[in-house]
Amino acid sequence: SYYFGATLDEWAPMSARRATYFREPAAPSTSVPCHALYPPGSITMIEALAMRDHLNGFDKYIPRDDRWPERVWDWPIEMPYRQGMRLRNMIWTGGQVPFEEAMNQGKAVHVGDPLAQASFTMGYVNDIVEAFGKTTQDYALLVCYFASDGSQAATEAFVGAIADTIGGELPPLTLVPQPKMHSDDITVEIWGVAKG
């Protein structure tokens, strides 16, 4: 989902409302700030991906397997979403941010060091994938939102920080530089898909 704003106070009410439409354990989620929405006046937008099966002429639920490594943070408000979920042979991670380990206070780590935040955040994404018995070489896609001045140098530095956590060939990357992320203290959000 996307929300118009750049503070926890702007994120929380809309996120809490969206969460009422999902039961725990809900699919992994990502919520990032945006700076313009269409139509004008909109304050949130939701995108969703869904997987169902078709068997004997009927629409069927696909069994899910979820993981939440102990080190990975929790939201500062109650949410039904899981941090990682496997459906068939695909592992989806929720959007990871540089929050304190195993906490739900919404406090950022490595404040003022965007590259350290990128590496730290990728550590969470890697932990989730590894909880399913997979490695960084199983990534099929990483989607990275990050605060940036939009320069090539800033993008290359960000990709370098991500590459250092992968330890091999990079998967396909979707890079979304933004003038500002969630707050001045949180400069990155990353989610991924892995073969599982």
Residue ranges and their predicted role:
Residues F4-A140, F146-G196:
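N-terminal presequence-like segments and the immediate start of the first folded domain
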